[in-house]
Amino acid sequence: MLPRTRLMPSGFIGPCLPSPAERPPSGPGWIHEIKHDGFRMMVRRDASGVRLLTRNGYGWSGRFPLIAAAAHALKIRSCLIDGEAVACDDEGLPVFDRLRYRRDDRRVFLYAFDLVELDGDDLRRERIERRKVLLIRLLAKAPVGLQVNDHIVAPGDVVFRHACQLGYEGIVSKRLGSPYISGRSHAWYD
């Protein structure tokens, strides 16, 4: 059997990956986000259309039509959004098996947590605070399928405890002022 090869899509930017941590960071200088039980997804919208890409660059545009349609409806020329595709139950909690086995694709949403490019501008060197503001503006009137994964400013251990009590997978902590760097980052922890 021949080894499987993969050509990276044109313009593919690998995601920023959190480093594992024993405990979430606390104190000033950190924000925290709920970690949903889903698939990491990069959503690229440009003149050629909408592409949904896994963290390894595989194309999944046909798998989640609600996300693709919502990205297509955005009133912009181009963007690259980083987030997590999540299937939710009736209470809004993630159900990984529904996502994994593609049950009820109408209930798969993208929880967007970063904006890497916008209208041709590369935002990777911008501070996370700036990227978050732009992401919130971009998705303020987005159709169903795209929503911002809100961040929380509070002690990390408190946020983690509450997230677990509510049935979420955990949290991702991000250092304020950090740029977007592909690969493992010590500015993001989970």
PLM segments and residue spans:
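Catalytic cores of nucleic-acid ligases and guanylyltransferases
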Residues: 1-190
